[in-house]
Amino acid sequence: MSIVKVSYFSDILCIWAYIAQARIDAVKQKFGDAVQLDHRFCSVFGNTPLKIPTTWRDKGEYAGFNAHLRNVALQFPHVEVHPDIWLTTRPPSSTAAHLFMTAVLQWQQEQEGEGASEATAQIFEKVLWAFRCAFFRDCRDIARRDVQCELAQAAGADVGAIEKRIHDGTAFAALTSDYQAADRMRIEGSPSFVLNEGRQKLYGNVGFRIIEANIQELLRAPGADQASWC
């Protein structure tokens, strides 16, 4: 069976990645094991005290960004956005959450190598979604380690093993690789789907049908030397 590998870059504080989760779920439901999704992180909100006041300087700064996010959410009824987002809770960086999630992924992969249950094999995505909901829906600061540990533990992750990977530096190394890969592949922002060994990149608010068409074309003509028409 042909397998399409998709590298999926996102920033955990990006509303478009929060919205795109429904498309990720649809891809998994339609294609199953024919698609191998590789979650990776890129840095869009790495320094929010600089980014938001600068980017939104002439548009109301945090209040303007808050209004923008709430207006965006109105177009997508499958997601919820807290009315006080970025007003009462302002994570200084997405990097803290990315680091923790990278350690979660490392732990999960190790468990899979030891014959983990199907439930354990899904913990990374459960924690990732819990982080996004905690921020966008519940207005919690997911840059805080105590919040991260609480959410991970509730999802069934081994918090001690996860923190070990942060303390010994292995999670830092893997996250650095993600950021370097994003630069090397010229990832423009979050979310970005990279297919066909980097030949195809889908960036931003991309509809499921476009993602589906690209995957179907690669399944039809999987050879690495064949360029997709999509």
Whereabouts are the PLM-identified features?
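Structural alpha/beta surface segment adjacent to cysteine/selenocysteine redox centers
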Residues: 21-134
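Extreme N-terminal starter segment of soluble prokaryotic enzymes
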Residues: 1-7
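C-terminal cap of thioredoxin/glutaredoxin-like
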Residues: 8-9, 13-39, 118-230
